[in-house]
């Protein structure tokens, strides 16, 4: 819509859930990729994994910064934290060292696609900081493995 209105906009409570899940996912991916970068099992991808791990770790902080501090949203924060989806995503990375690059590529592709969908649900004015964060994350992931 050209008038700034968004169909099916994200509520503040939904935003809390979205940003917590994104922060936890980014943290978990960062940890996994950092481990891969230093375990010596696949020297050919260690630099790529280290770079991605550092960026994803930084993204986690950016997502946490998007979460409003309010006792009124404590239930949403608790409900979103530790969501079961994280286990399923990380299971996709349980692969032999030689398959790491090909395993991480679709996970990051899905993250990029998800951020595109989320950005369409955010208001260009009220959610401008979140949209900026999405743009920064997408720019950081442009050189991801494919």
Protein language model regions, located:
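Acidic/His metal-coordination segments adjacent to aromatic residues that form catalytic metal sites
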Residues: 2-20, 79-107
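Internal, well-ordered domain-core segments that constitute the primary functional module
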Residues: 120-146
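Leu/Val/Ala/Ile-rich N-terminal alpha-helices, chiefly Sec-type signal peptides and the beginnings
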Residues: 2-44
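Generic structural signal for well-ordered, non-transmembrane alpha-helical segments
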Residues: 20, 24-27, 50, 54-61, ...
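Amphipathic alpha-helical assembly/interaction segments
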Residues: 8-16, 45-48, 61-64, 97-102, ...
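Helix-loop segments that flank and shape redox-cofactor active sites
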Residues: 28-54, 114-130
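Conserved alpha-helical segments that form or flank metal/cofactor-binding pockets of metalloenzymes
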Residues: 47-87
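Short, highly charged low-complexity linear segments
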Residues: 85-96, 111-125
């Amino acid at each position: 819509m050209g008038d700034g209105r968004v169909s099916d906009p994200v509520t503040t409570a939904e935003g809390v859930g979205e940003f917590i899940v994104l922060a936890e996912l980014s943290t978990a991916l960062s940890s996994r990729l950092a481990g891969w970068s230093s375990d010596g099992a696949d020297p050919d991808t260690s630099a790529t994994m280290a770079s991605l791990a550092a960026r994803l770790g930084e993204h986690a902080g950016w997502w946490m910064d998007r979460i409003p501090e309010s006792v009124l949203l404590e239930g949403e924060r608790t409900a979103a934290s530790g969501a079961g989806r994280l286990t399923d995503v990380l299971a996709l990375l349980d692969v032999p060292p030689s398959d790491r690059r090909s395993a991480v590529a679709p996970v990051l592709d899905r993250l990029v696609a998800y951020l595109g969908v989320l950005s369409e649900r955010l208001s260009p004015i009220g959610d401008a900081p979140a949209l900026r964060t999405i743009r920064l994350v997408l720019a950081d992931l442009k050189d991801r493995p494919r």
